[in-house]
From Swiss-Prot:
Annotated membrane topology: Single-pass type III membrane protein
Region (Disordered): 60-83
GO MF entry, a single one: proton transmembrane transporter activity
Chain ranges passing through the membrane: 23-43
Protein name: Matrix protein 2
Family: Belongs to the influenza viruses matrix protein M2 family.
All ranges on the Virion surface side of the membrane: 1-22
Keyword Transcription regulation: no
Chain's gene name: M
Chain positions carrying an annotated carbohydrate: 20
Record function comment: Forms a proton-selective ion channel that is necessary for the efficient release of the viral genome during virus entry. After attaching to the cell surface, the virion enters the cell by endocytosis. Acidification of the endosome triggers M2 ion channel activity.
Superkingdom: Viruses
Site note Essential for channel activity, possibly by being protonated during channel activation, and by forming the channel gate and the selective filter, residues: 37
Length: 97
């Protein structure tokens, strides 16, 4: 005798929805929160690189460049840009021989 014949299978009545009162405000609120959470999660996954780069580098104000020669300002800008460019490589490819 196989195991499949000994397992009880639920009847059609067992799969029916038991929450007939779907106009309950708690159920509606939970549904709205769930949908909003899903939308925000999808947007986060789509734009996380832009969002976190903006948070990491965009909100920080650099040191004041008052009284600093233009050549040093340009050097500082290049260093900052190279730091941003390096940050693009979150994922590293490792090749095994």
């Amino acid at each position: 005798m196989s195991l499949l014949t000994e397992v009880e299978t639920p009847t059609r009545n067992g799969w029916e929805c038991r929450c007939n009162d779907s106009s309950d405000p708690l159920i509606i609120a939970a549904s709205i929160i769930g949908i909003l959470h899903l939308i925000l999660w999808i947007l986060n996954r789509l734009f996380f690189k832009c969002i976190y780069r903006r948070l990491k580098y965009g909100l920080k104000r650099g040191p004041s460049t008052e009284g600093v020669p233009e050549s040093m300002r340009e050097e500082y800008r290049q260093e900052q840009q190279s730091a941003v460019d390096v940050d693009d490589g979150h994922f590293v490819n490792i090749e095994l021989e």
